Amino acid sequence: MSLETFRESKAYKWTSKVISFLIGQWFFIFLGVFIALAHSYPEFAKQGGTIRAEYSIGYGAVAVIFLISGLSMSTKQLLVNVANWRAHFTVLSMSFLVTSAIIYGIASGIKASHNGQIDDWLLIGLIVTHACPTTVSSNVVMTKQAHGNDILTLCEVFIGNVLGAFITPALLQMYMRGTWEIGNPSHQTQGDSTVQELYAHTMKQLGLSVFVPLFVGQVVQNIFPKQTKWCLTTFKLNKVGSFMLLLIMFQSFSTAFAQHAFTSVSHASIIFLVFFNIGIYLFFTVLTFFYSRPFWILRVFKEEPNESSSKLYRYSYAFFRPFYYNRKDTVAVMLCGPAKTAALGVSLVSSQYGSHNPKLGIILVPLVLYQAEQVMTANVLVSFMRKWIHAEDKVPEDEETSVGSDNDPKK
């Protein structure tokens, strides 16, 4: 049989399709491998473990992701997005207030039903998870893959995590009252650090793993633009960012397995969390979409102001119309709004409840599972988001995104 005949055979075609499919799903395959390794050898990559993952991965892997971001983004666009206060308001209000309030209501309803299979501390962990700030690394990686505004995403994760050191403890004090008094951090005698120490730790982590590599990347890009572009395309550094994200999840699962988090709750609770996390992440993603593109704005502000328009219309248009974001910005907000950080989240939980608290493992289960499932779900959604973004390329002028927006949708 000749080579050409073999290539035309059904066996060769089916084998090629299977190999192409497996290559396309490399992220999920490696994720499964890393979870299996974390289960079998949790001491290797847990916090304080063999490789001191809180430094080698917590700082190193995150720094690589933001170094790549610094090398690939325009300094001018970075400054433009830093000034986009409307997007900051949308993401912060969704990430901290809307999501946590909805979860608080759901958890309170489950607690009121007196379901003995769902541990109260697991529900407390659910509330704690959704009071945490948005995740740092996966948001940037996923937004870049979806061809969204990853520069805006970078601004949101930095602002959200800096403020999260203050907002999350305040939210826990607000929610953990009455029927949830048992979970109030003020009643935990094993707390490890004060809010001031937590904030210092957060600023150190964000400074060394986000700001410094981002700054270095920007300097290198502006001094050596051609060489930087060549490196980005030749070495496919975007794939490197995705692999760094896998290492971060490897660390989270290793820490969870080392703390026996998954064996501290019932199988029914784990099954409930797995399906609940996927459903609530999709719900929050859809909710964030409508929050980012309110239909009433287009109905009220159909036309750009002109000389015959009233002052009220002109001022209202200038203030409200930019809240209807273009598609790239919408994708950035959609990925930031529902996401929750495990890196800072673990530090926040440990500082509030104490690393030696016997209930810590149960509290961390929702956080670790949600992080993994949000990344897997977002990895599926990015292809649809990418198609939606490029669908407007076929339209000469997209009235939904170009009029009154702070940012040009073509950027």
Curated annotation (Swiss-Prot):
The cross-references to Pfam families, in alphabetical order and at most eight, read: SBF_like
The record's gene field reads: RCH1
Positions of disulphide bridges: none
Q: Which family does it belong to?
A: Belongs to the bile acid:sodium symporter (BASS) (TC 2.A.28) family.
Membrane topology, Extracellular segments: 39-52, 111-120, 172-204, 264-269, 351-361
How does the UniProt record describe the way this protein sits in the membrane? Multi-pass membrane protein
The answer on whether this UniProt entry bears the keyword rRNA-binding reads no
- Enumerate the Gene Ontology biological process terms: calcium ion import; negative regulation of cytosolic calcium ion concentration
What subcellular locations does the record give?
Answer: Cell membrane; Bud neck
Q: Which residues lie on this side of the membrane: Cytoplasmic?
A: 1-17, 74-89, 142-150, 226-242, 291-329, 383-411
**UniProt keyword terms in alphabetical order:** Calcium, Calcium transport, Cell membrane, Ion transport, Membrane, Transmembrane, Transmembrane helix, Transport
InterPro entries, per the entry: Na+/solute_symporter_sf (IPR038770), Put_Na-Bile_cotransptr (IPR016833)
Under the cellular component aspect of Gene Ontology, which terms does the record hold?
cellular bud neck; plasma membrane
Protein name per its UniProtKB record: Solute carrier RCH1
Q: Where exactly are the transmembrane stretches of this chain?
A: 18-38, 53-73, 90-110, 121-141, 151-171, 205-225, 243-263, 270-290, 330-350, 362-382
Keyword Transmembrane, does the record have it?
A: yes
Annotated knockout phenotype: Leads to modest tolerance to azoles and terbinafine, but not to amphotericin B and nystatin. Elevates the intracellular Ca(2+) and leads to the activation of the calcium/calcineurin signaling pathway.
Its biological purpose is as follows: Solute carrier protein that negatively regulates the cytosolic homeostasis in response to high levels of extracellular calcium.
